[in-house]
């Protein structure tokens, strides 16, 4: 059976070769015996190269014979055969392929076409190899059969591959859309956060005004009671002064005069012993113990955002002295030592930066300013000029709140924004929301909002501390970074 298949395969290969030979003959010119060039068909139906048949009939004026069948035609009739021209090109290509296949598909041992396939050795073999001792016991089939079988197997593999390719293509397209979707989600969340904090600020401001109004009402109530009690005590004081004068006068009288109404005087003195002298308490009964619980939650949120800020001596102006724990800074008129002029160090503006800057997120820290009369706190961007004279404004990379002359507060915008602060802050809270582009300042002393800068931050931001120049004993105190105080 195997030998029959091999013989059939050999016959099939021979038949294919014969068909190719016939195609080459049909595509050849009978005059030049080469492939037809610009094939034309004459009246008898035979085809020739246009140039060949033209030369063949060159000296004739009538009765033009066919070079093949010798049939003559009265006229020089040459009709282009474009379809045959296409077949000629195909024949040329097939000849090239045949030559290539012949060169590549010959058995290296027997120089016969590799027309069969051995399953066991997974290799192409020729007819002689197939009946040899090496492959006689193997399963050998015609190359076309093996090709068809493996083609079907490959096609079965192709479907899941195409499905997986489609899945990956869809997934990739989905992933490529996600940055835009993420941007929209982030912007939506950003607007939500801004809206929530705006509402929170509004409610805090309202609550602040309510509490301050209640505090003022309580102050007026206590002042009224103090005035009334002072008037009452004034009346008692006058009564007692009159009684004391009366007693002194009695003591100077003669016996008859003294005894005349001494009992009445003694009764008055006795009543004085039981007279109650009361004072008005100025203790504030209405305090922050009733502060709404939702704002304690805000404080808890801020606690989670507390930044561990320490001062960087490499940035400190030479006239600034830092504490050992790098939490405090103060100005000294005489430099204690010469410091290297590094690129990070400020040489004109007497300030110092923190050791850590921020390029994202939300961060909160507090600075104790005490009774100082001159200071500034805030942030600056990484690229600010640190040498020579400068103007610390948002346009130059500085966002600050400052105090000078003991009572003048301002946000250092262009121009300065005066800040009307009712209660002098002993401690200032600073809240940076990098993505939202906000930097907020709070008076920790009375828990009020001072000012908020709104900008677009594109660089690393560094916490900045300016203790002010030493102008009097009060401003000699340092600026100190403190852990945030509790509101609870």
Swiss-Prot record:
Example GO biological process: positive regulation of apoptotic signaling pathway
Record-level GO cellular component terms: cytoplasm; cytosol; mitochondrion; nucleus
Start and end residues, zinc fingers (B box-type): 102-143
Pathway noted in the entry: Protein modification; protein ubiquitination
Zn finger intervals (RING-type): 29-70
Domain of life: Eukaryota
Positions of region (Interaction with CDKN1A): 268-307, 359-488
Top EC class, one word: transferase
Catalysed reactions, semicolon-separated: S-ubiquitinyl-[E2 ubiquitin-conjugating enzyme]-L-cysteine + [acceptor protein]-L-lysine = [E2 ubiquitin-conjugating enzyme]-L-cysteine + N(6)-ubiquitinyl-[acceptor protein]-L-lysine
Purpose of the protein: E3 ubiquitin-protein ligase. May facilitate apoptosis by inhibiting APC/C-Cdh1-mediated poly-ubiquitination and subsequent proteasome-mediated degradation of the pro-apoptotic protein MOAP1. Regulates the G1/S transition of the cell cycle and DNA damage-induced G2 arrest by stabilizing CDKN1A/p21. Positively regulates CDKN1A/p21 stability by competing with DTL for CDKN1A/p21 binding, therefore disrupting DCX(DTL) E3 ubiquitin ligase complex-mediated CDKN1A/p21 ubiquitination and degradation.
Subunit organization: Interacts with MOAP1. Interacts with CDKN1A.
Protein name per the record: E3 ubiquitin-protein ligase TRIM39
Source species: Rattus norvegicus
């Amino acid at each position: 059976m195997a030998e029959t298949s091999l013989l059939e395969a050999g016959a099939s290969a021979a038949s294919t070769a014969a068909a190719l030979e016939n195609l080459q003959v049909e595509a050849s010119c009978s005059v030049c015996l080469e492939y037809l060039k610009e094939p034309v068909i004459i009246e008898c139906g035979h085809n020739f190269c246009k140039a060949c048949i033209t030369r063949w009939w060159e000296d004739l004026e009538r009765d033009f014979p066919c070079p093949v069948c010798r049939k003559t035609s009265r006229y020089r009739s040459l009709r282009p055969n474009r379809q045959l021209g296409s077949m000629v090109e195909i024949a040329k290509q097939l000849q090239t392929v045949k030559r290539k296949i012949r060169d590549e598909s010959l058995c290296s041992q027997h120089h016969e076409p590799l027309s069969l396939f051995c399953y066991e050795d997974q290799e192409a073999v020729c007819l002689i190899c197939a009946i040899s001792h090496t492959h006689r016991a193997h399963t050998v089939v015609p190359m076309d059969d093996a090709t068809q079988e493996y083609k079907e197997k490959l096609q079965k593999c192709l479907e899941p591959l195409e499905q997986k390719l489609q899945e990956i293509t869809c997934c990739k397209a989905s992933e490529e859309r996600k940055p835009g979707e993420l941007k929209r989600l982030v912007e939506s969340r950003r607007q939500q956060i801004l809206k929530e904090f705006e509402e929170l600020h509004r409610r805090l401001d309202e609550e602040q005004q309510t509490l301050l109004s209640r505090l003022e009402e309580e102050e007026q109530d206590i002042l009224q009671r103090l005035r009334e009690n002072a008037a009452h005590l004034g009346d008692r004081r006058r009564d007692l002064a009159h009684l004391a004068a009366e007693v002194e006068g009695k003591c100077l009288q003669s016996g008859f005069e003294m005894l005349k109404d001494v009992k009445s005087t003694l009764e008055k003195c006795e009543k004085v012993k039981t007279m109650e002298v009361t004072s008005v308490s100025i203790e504030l009964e209405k305090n922050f113990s009733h502060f709404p619980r939702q704002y304690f939650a805000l404080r808890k949120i801020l606690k989670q955002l507390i930044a561990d800020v320490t001062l960087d001596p490499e940035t400190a102006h030479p006239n600034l002295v830092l504490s050992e724990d790098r939490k405090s800074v103060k100005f000294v008129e005489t430099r204690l030592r010469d410091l290297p002029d590094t690129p990070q160090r400020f040489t004109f503006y007497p300030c110092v930066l923190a050791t850590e800057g921020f390029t994202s997120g939300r961060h909160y820290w507090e600075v104790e300013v005490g009774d100082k009369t001159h200071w500034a706190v805030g942030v600056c961007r990484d690229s600010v000029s640190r040498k020579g004279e400068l103007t610390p404004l948002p346009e130059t990379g500085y966002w600050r709140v400052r105090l000078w002359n003991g009572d003048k507060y301002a946000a250092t915008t262009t121009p300065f924004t005066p800040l009307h602060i009712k209660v002098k802050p002993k401690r200032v809270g600073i809240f940076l929301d990098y993505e939202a582009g906000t930097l907020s300042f709070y008076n920790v002393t009375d828990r009020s909002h001072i000012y908020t800068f709104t900008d677009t931050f594109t660089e690393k931001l560094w916490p900045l501390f300016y203790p002010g120049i030493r102008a009097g004993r009060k401003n000699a105190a340092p600026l100190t970074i403190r852990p945030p105080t509790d509101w609870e």
